[in-house]
């Protein structure tokens, strides 16, 4: 394993492009703290988004890990088109790793910014930060730490989006998460949290930079289970997984990468109860 990592480091160091190699292997909390600060500044100026839907039962779509390389993201575009055509659906989420290399973020951001499509909400992934990608990502999406509401005729649901692209939430974001749950969760019917990196990992398929420390995992679990969070969605591993801890569902998505054999997205049906389905591509 050590030999393999050393080979990867040497290959990356030989590249002409400025790849942030250190960040791939060592979680840097100062990076996420800086991004959180910038995200919260944007949030304060922009205000909280509230989506109003005409019924108490509604649907939303969620995907992760597009990994755009040299071709436009056909499966992501298809999912957005399906969501728009679905009369029960009103928005979608994209949980990070838009990029594989350093180019063509606009192929996704243009789809998400198209006013003819339903609203889309994104968070940053670890691949999106390589090649100093945060500035490009921020210019397109503005914030990766935020929450929004969905208002129905009788209820309000809260959706919390988190930045874990360095394999840590960092102290600033943890404090922000605790505050949001303490001050905004009451009065909401359901609470959904979305994050790129898996909080409950069931395999070791990804780099160690994206593992939460055990201490941080315990703290996050304590925060989430103590605030009556319903579901936590993540991507990153490219292989679906469903775990339950403390009454909270932790769901890892497949990737939606065009050449992935197991590519899928999810639909989530929200009402008095919550249902979900993985939708594969044929």
Walk through the language-model features, giving the residues of each.
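Core catalytic region of metal-dependent phosphoesterases/phosphodiesterases
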Residues: 74-150
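His/acidic metal-ligating clusters that form di-metal
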Residues: 81-91, 158, 167-250, 277
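Active-site glycine-centered loops adjacent to acidic/histidine catalytic or metal-binding residues
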Residues: 65, 96-97, 125-126, 196, ...
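Sec-dependent signal peptide recognition
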Residues: 2-8
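C-terminal motif of bacterial Sec signal peptides marking the signal peptidase cleavage site
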Residues: 12-15
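Binuclear metal-dependent phosphoesterase catalytic core
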Residues: 20-41, 240-282
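Beta-strand-turn-beta hairpins that frame and shape the catalytic cleft
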Residues: 49-61, 147-161, 190, 244-250, ...
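N-terminal active-site segment of His-dependent metallophosphoesterases
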Residues: 17-106
């Amino acid at each position: 394993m050590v030999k393999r990592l050393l080979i990867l480091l040497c290959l990356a160091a030989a590249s002409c492009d400025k790849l942030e190699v250190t960040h791939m292997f060592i979680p840097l909390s100062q990076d996420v703290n800086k991004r959180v600060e910038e995200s919260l500044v944007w949030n304060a100026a922009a205000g909280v988004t509230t989506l109003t839907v005409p019924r108490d039962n509604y649907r939303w779509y969620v995907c992760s890990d597009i990994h755009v390389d040299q071709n436009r993201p056909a499966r992501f575009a298809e999912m957005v088109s399906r969501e728009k055509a679905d009369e029960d659906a009103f928005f979608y989420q994209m949980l990070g790793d838009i990029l594989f290399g350093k180019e063509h973020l606009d192929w996704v951001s243009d789809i998400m910014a198209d006013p003819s499509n339903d609203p889309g909400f994104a968070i940053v992934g670890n691949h999106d930060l390589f090649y100093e990608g945060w500035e490009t990502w921020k210019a397109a999406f503005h914030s990766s730490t935020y929450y929004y509401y969905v208002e129905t005729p009788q209820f309000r649901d809260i959706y919390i989006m988190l930045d874990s692209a360095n394999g840590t939430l960092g102290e600033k974001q943890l404090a922000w998460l605790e505050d949001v749950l303490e001050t905004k969760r009451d009065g909401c019917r359901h609470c959904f949290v979305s994050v790129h990196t898996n909080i409950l990992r069931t395999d070791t398929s990804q780099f160690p930079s994206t593992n939460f420390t055990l201490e941080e995992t315990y703290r996050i679990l304590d925060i989430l289970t103590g605030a009556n969070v319903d579901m936590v969605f993540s991507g990153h591993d490219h292989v679906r997984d469903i775990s339950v801890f403390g009454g909270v569902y932790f769901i890892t998505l497949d990737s939606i990468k065009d050449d992935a054999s197991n590519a899928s997205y999810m639909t989530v049906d929200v009402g008095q109860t919550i249902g979900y389905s993985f939708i594969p591509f044929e």
